[in-house]
Regions:
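Phosphate/pyrophosphate-binding loops at sites that engage ATP/ADP/AMP, CoA/4′-phosphopantetheine
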Residues: 37-49
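Conserved small/polar residues in nucleotide/adenosyl-binding loops
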Residues: 110-114
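Short glycine-rich phosphate-binding loop at a beta-alpha junction
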Residues: 49-55
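Extreme N-terminal starter segment of soluble prokaryotic enzymes
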Residues: 2-6
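Active-site pocket-shaping loop/turn-to-helix segments
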Residues: 12-34, 56, 78-93
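Conserved catalytic cysteine-centered active-site region
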Residues: 56-106
């Protein structure tokens, strides 16, 4: 098996405090994405990200993955925002299958919850 999906970086963030002190959801998504890239211990991983998956939340952003990718230099990645209610495991399974098939090299998966 040439293409084997492996988890190479994790980002996690929890904010507490008054509403005025908390970051917008878009900034939180950016922070955890960058933290996961840094956690991989190879910033070059962003050059392999072919897809960015973000499950839809209760925010008004049209395509937060595109904004993150363009801001951080991996703008060729295909982005998707999935519908509310889609099982998160299905997204992970789909990404793994695409990697196994050689359709993509790496995926960034960002999920927020309140």
């Amino acid at each position: 098996m040439k293409n084997r999906p492996v988890l190479v970086g994790i980002g996690s963030l929890q904010q507490k405090g008054s509403f005025s002190e908390l970051d917008e959801a878009l900034i939180l998504m950016e922070k955890v994405t960058i933290e996961a890239i840094e956690d991989s211990q190879s910033l070059e991983i962003k050059n392999y990200i072919d897809e960015i998956q973000i499950p839809k939340g209760y925010w008004a952003y049209r395509d937060p993955g595109k904004w993150i990718a363009e801001k951080h230099g991996f703008s060729k990645a295909k982005t998707s925002v999935t519908k509310i209610g889609v099982l998160q495991q299905n997204l992970i399974n789909s990404a793994c299958k695409k990697i196994l098939n050689g359709d993509i090299r790496a995926v960034s998966y960002t999920h927020l919850r309140a």
